[in-house]
């Protein structure tokens, strides 16, 4: 991997192929419309999708065919604004929503812009990501951070936005019992959002005890470590150990692992709600008989939509969710490749990469 250039104007972390990355000085982006702003990117979180592109060169139909800047969980400082920008000014600290919809297709007009047919999403081929010094995006996809939210915390508005969308899909209401499978960053944040929405019992499920220990301190009221027994047995044990009666109200899978999907269906009460937030294999077996006979409400969840980022910022600003606890490391920009290697091995919970030239 080539080393970074000290005099670079817009140093970027570029994926060329599987396990092949480089630092490249790219042109400073320009305003594409009067409604755009240019942001000096200060912090970027490493997401599982970034690591997957680095490790495999593709995610499903999205294949890296040309060099692509990685990263999409970012925050920064506004350095330039378009002539029509009214909600931001130079110097504002912002969280950056990295997916820009066309605003014209049927899903966009229906208010589901996360399903936009022409979505331009950062670090999803063929679009460059945010691991660069500068990035351009529309003003309404930048969320001004109050003084109570630091720039490192601002980078976590992206995974928190994902969690907000998942929990909204589940329609979690006060007094409910929610089971969350997968205690990675998104799963942990789902626990926190469910708590903020009034869930009275939140059970975090994972096979790694350290993650369960953290989940219990962070937002979960209970934890469950599944055995290698069939999903029905794990579900029965979870119900018994937590006195869930006929089952949980809501099950959220943030792991994408087939045994979790099965256990999630079986742990629900009749009429309960299941939301698939984690992505695993493109196809897997599914307990359709249990889903039908219990008349479950089953939904998918993809990224985030209208109001999700805004609510994420509000939940942190109000003190209901403390995302700072998830940040287990901040590395220099020149150490980005090693950070990717560390994240692949499961080191830490959320690692941030500081922008070029930052301490």
Swiss-Prot record:
It is an enzyme of class 1 (oxidoreductase). It catalyses: xylitol + NAD(+) = D-xylulose + NADH + H(+). One of its GO terms (biological process) is L-arabinose catabolic process to xylulose 5-phosphate. It comes from the Eukaryota. Its EC number is 1.1.1.9. SUPFAM superfamilies: GroES-like, NAD(P)-binding Rossmann-fold domains. Keywords: Carbohydrate metabolism, Metal-binding, NAD, Oxidoreductase, Xylose metabolism, Zinc. InterPro entries: ADH-like_C, ADH-like_N, ADH_Zn_CS, GroES-like_sf, NAD(P)-bd_dom_sf, PKS_ER, SDH-like. One of its GO terms (molecular function) is zinc ion binding. Binds 1 zinc ion per subunit. NAD(+) binds at residues 182-187. The keyword Zinc applies. Its cofactor is Zn(2+). Zn(2+) binds at residues 47, 72-73. Pathway: Carbohydrate degradation; L-arabinose degradation via L-arabinitol; D-xylulose 5-phosphate from L-arabinose (fungal route): step 4/5. Xylitol dehydrogenase which catalyzes the conversion of xylitol to D-xylulose. Xylose is a major component of hemicelluloses such as xylan. Most fungi utilize D-xylose via three enzymatic reactions, xylose reductase (XR), xylitol dehydrogenase (XDH), and xylulokinase, to form xylulose 5-phosphate, which enters pentose phosphate pathway. Belongs to the zinc-containing alcohol dehydrogenase family. This is Probable D-xylulose reductase A.
């Amino acid at each position: 991997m080539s080393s970074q250039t000290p005099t670079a104007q817009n140093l970027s972390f570029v994926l060329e192929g599987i396990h092949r990355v480089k630092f490249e000085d790219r042109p400073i982006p320009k305003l594409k419309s009067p409604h755009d702003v240019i942001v000096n990117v200060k912090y970027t979180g490493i997401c599982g999708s970034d690591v997957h592109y680095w490790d495999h060169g593709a995610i499903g139909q999205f294949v890296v065919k040309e060099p692509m800047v990685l990263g999409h969980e970012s925050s920064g400082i506004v350095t330039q604004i378009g002539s029509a920008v009214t909600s931001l000014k130079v110097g504002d600290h912002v969280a950056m929503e990295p997916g820009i919809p066309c605003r014209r297709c049927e899903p966009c007009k229906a208010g589901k812009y996360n399903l936009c047919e022409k979505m331009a999403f950062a670090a999803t081929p063929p679009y460059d990501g945010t691991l660069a010094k500068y990035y351009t995006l529309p003003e309404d996809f930048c969320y001004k951070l109050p003084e109570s939210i630091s720039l490192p915390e601002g980078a976590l508005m992206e995974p928190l936005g994902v969690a907000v969308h998942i929990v909204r899909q589940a329609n979690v209401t006060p007094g409910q019992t929610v089971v969350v499978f997968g205690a990675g960053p998104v799963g942990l944040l789902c626990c926190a959002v469910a708590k903020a929405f009034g869930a009275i019992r939140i059970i975090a499920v994972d096979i790694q005890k350290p993650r369960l220990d953290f989940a219990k301190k962070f937002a979960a009221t209970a934890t469950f470590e599944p055995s290698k027994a069939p999903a029905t047995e794990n579900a029965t044990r979870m119900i018994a150990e937590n006195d869930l009666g006929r089952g949980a109200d809501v099950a959220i899978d943030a792991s994408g692992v087939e045994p979790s999907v099965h256990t999630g269906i079986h742990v629900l009460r009749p009429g309960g709600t299941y939301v698939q937030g984690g992505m695993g294999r493109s196809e897997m077996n599914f307990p359709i008989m249990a889903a039908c006979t219990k008349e479950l409400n089953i939904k998918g969840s993809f990224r985030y939509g209208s109001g999700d980022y805004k609510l994420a910022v509000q939940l942190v600003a109000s003190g209901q969710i403390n995302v700072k606890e998830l940040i287990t490391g901040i590395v220099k920009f020149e150490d980005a490749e090693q950070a990717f290697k560390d994240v692949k091995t499961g080191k830490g919970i959320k690692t941030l990469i500081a922008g070029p030239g930052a301490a």
